[in-house]
Amino acid sequence: MNSRDSAASEITPEVLLRAYACGIFPMAESADDPSLFWVEPELRGVIPLDGFRVASRLARTVRSDAFTLTVNQAFKAVMDGCAAPQPGREDTWINRRIRELYGGLHAMGHCHSVECWQDGELVGGLYGVSLGRAFFGESMFHRARDASKVALVHLVARLIAGGFELLDTQYVTEHLKTFGAVEIPRRRYTVLLEKALTGPAANFARLPTDRPLAGAEALAIIAERG
């Protein structure tokens, strides 16, 4: 379903959460387009948490702790990084209204960022929405090789430790396929989403948020689940 919403100002963070619970999410045509439209893909991208794959070379990078990882320490800067053009991604769909809405979800504790630092500089990261035991990945960026990949590894470790059941990537790219992402039909996705929204909520802060998590620890958590 792609329905144009010409009155984006009527969407609130609360409305956004209800939309995620129904399996839909907003996008904009471009950063300069003030309007939003709702999206409900026929085929949905997910990464099974018990099937998350880390290539050997990336595992060595994660284990080396070449990057320092933090959580929810630079949410706005991560959104800025995701909205900026990158090689292979010259255009962005993150407009001002998207920034406002997800900033509101962050203030409510439903939107989180994972930051990747090198020598005190933010070089990569990602952000997404948590609801129940589901996490909806929104966007990621990198300014140094493997930075966003390392952020994803740490995110998955945090989701596993916190009791999450569903990692929704919305769409599947060749990049995400290397981590085990697959496409599933909307009907199957709806079943998984309903299950993830029933019962106790997961805890995104189950792992410490006040100190960096070692790469070896993140990999051990993932290996235990897999």
Swiss-Prot record:
GO cellular component terms attached to this protein's record: cytoplasm
Annotated function: Functions in the N-end rule pathway of protein degradation where it conjugates Leu, Phe and, less efficiently, Met from aminoacyl-tRNAs to the N-termini of proteins containing an N-terminal arginine or lysine.
Predominant place of localization: cytoplasm
InterPro entries: Acyl_CoA_acyltransferase, Leu/Phe-tRNA_Trfase, Leu/Phe-tRNA_Trfase_C, Leu/Phe-tRNA_Trfase_N
Residue ranges that the Swiss-Prot or TrEMBL entry lists as coiled coil: none
Keyword match Transferase: yes
Enzyme Commission number(s) of this protein: 2.3.2.6
Name of this protein: Leucyl/phenylalanyl-tRNA--protein transferase
Similarity comment: family membership: Belongs to the L/F-transferase family.
Subcellular location field: Cytoplasm
Pfam families referenced in this protein's UniProt entry, alphabetically: Leu_Phe_trans
Record keywords: Acyltransferase, Cytoplasm, Transferase
Superkingdom as given in the UniProt entry: Bacteria
